[in-house]
Amino acid sequence: MNILSNIIPSFLNSITNFPRREVISFAYLSIEKIFGFSKSDCIVNSKKVLTNENINQLNKIIGDLKKNIPIQYILGETTFCGLKFNVNNSTLIPRNETEELVNLILNYKFNSLLDIGTGSGCIAISIAKKTASSVSAIDISHQAISMAKKNAIINNVSVDFRAADIFNFDDKRKYDIIVSNPPYVCESDKQNLHKNVVDHEPHLALFVKDSNPLIFYKRIAQYALTNLNKKGHLFFEINEKYSNQIIEMLTDLNFVEIELKKDINDRNRIIKSSIK
């Protein structure tokens, strides 16, 4: 690995614990991080000679990938809704499916929004970037809130971030929209996840007990009943296995206009509901 064009073959030869297409993507992300080159830049600069520092950086990335560390944590950043976000293992890595949740919310008119379980701040910051609305967000993790605040600065937006536990959140403010992508993967489903997720992403943000999979949805819905403005909306990202149970729970709590939306993979992923 002495010139730029050798990088992708080196990644493919060294990394066998991810699909080929993902490894190629990891290589391009690494090149962009180290050299600032796009894919087209790679063609123009294919004969660029790598320095010893470049080679050491790339070998470190390859070594970390072989340990199943997510590329986003290795590089310390990811992209969401066209914005750059810093991430580490105290924050869940933003997913493409969650971009659909943001885009859906942006179809509505609102003056105030609360994001519950904000993590890296990706939902709150993306919405604040694209609206003039007042945006607030909470997370139980102080480390996540610290990262979210840094991401707000990076993206030049104002969001009211607070460290708070939704189960002990005494907030008198009301909002036009409340949104949450809460923990929704049952502990028994760990075996179905890639090792890089289970070993490195924060379990606090991922998993719920099999005995009470709707614990966060129920609490957030109850909170929304008292803290949504009249005709306000509640948005959830969900585990598709529990879509019917969540709809039933919202119906029992007298939410109206309940809608189930599919994601880009044709899976039940978002539930929108409203109060009268």
Where are these regions (language model features)?
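Conserved SAM/SAH cofactor-binding pocket of Class I
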Residues: 97-192, 219
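Conserved beta-strand segments of alpha/beta enzyme cores
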Residues: 84, 134, 158-160, 256-259
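A short N-terminal interaction module
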Residues: 1-58
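Conserved AdoMet
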Residues: 33-107
